[in-house]
């Protein structure tokens, strides 16, 4: 009725349930526990620029102070990996800002999402506190961080991915030198 223990060198039975490596037997929760253990030990890196280093990119600082929805839209598109466009995110930010004045609550979730994606530390205080107290500085810091990670913020997610794909295709593979005399 029950299968015998797997012999040494024999293939395990295909059950559709991932094995966790415990001698060929499925251990309940083993795969999930391992996945969560890896996530919990993610390295925490410092931000590449400080919160108050807005003048490192004067153009972005001016744009953000005059119309923060533009900077938010650009960063949100990259953080969402292209699932929402810059225009959509920026318009939603502007709508929340005009209707409620609580755009900081909306934007702090994107800061938290960005920190999770790139393993950034909570600094100098919680995401919501940073966005509620220093909205423009927080948006500028997120923009600079993505820019320093190689994103061209003016072209969006899909164009950045296309550009990275072309750059990878243009680099020839490394060839090991052959036999020499």
Swiss-Prot record:
Tissue distribution: Expressed in leaves, stalks and tassel spikelets. Detected in roots, apical meristems and immature ears, but not in pollen. In leaves, not detected in the cell division zone, expressed at low levels in the cell expansion and transition zones and at high levels in the mature or fully grown tissue.
Pfam families per record: PLAC8
Record's keyword annotation contains Transmembrane: yes
Keyword NAD set for record: no
UniProt entry keywords in alphabetical sequence: Membrane, Transmembrane, Transmembrane helix
Subcellular location, record wording: Membrane
PANTHER family membership: DUF614 FAMILY PROTEIN-RELATED (PTHR15907)
Function according to Swiss-Prot or TrEMBL: May act as a negative regulator of cell number.
Family the UniProt entry places it in: Belongs to the cornifelin family.
Record's protein name: Cell number regulator 2
Provenance organism: Zea mays
Organism lineage: Eukaryota, Viridiplantae, Streptophyta, Embryophyta, Tracheophyta
């Amino acid at each position: 009725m029950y299968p015998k223990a797997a012999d040494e060198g024999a293939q395990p039975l295909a059950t559709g349930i991932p094995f966790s490596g415990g001698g060929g037997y499925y251990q309940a929760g083993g795969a999930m526990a391992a996945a969560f253990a890896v996530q919990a030990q993610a390295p925490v890196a410092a931000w590449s620029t400080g919160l108050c280093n807005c003048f490192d990119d004067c153009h972005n600082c001016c744009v953000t102070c005059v119309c923060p929805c533009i900077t938010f839209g650009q960063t949100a598109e990259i953080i969402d990996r292209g699932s929402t466009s810059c225009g959509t995110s920026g318009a939603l930010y502007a709508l929340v800002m005009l209707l409620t004045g609580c755009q900081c609550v909306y934007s702090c979730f994107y800061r938290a999402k960005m920190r999770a994606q790139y393993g950034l530390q909570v600094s100098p205080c919680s995401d919501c506190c940073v966005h509620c107290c220093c909205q423009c500085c927080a948006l500028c810091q997120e923009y600079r961080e993505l820019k320093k990670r190689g994103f061209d913020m003016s072209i969006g997610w899909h164009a950045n991915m296309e550009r990275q794909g072309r750059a990878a295709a243009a680099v020839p593979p490394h060839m090991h030198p052959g036999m020499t005399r």
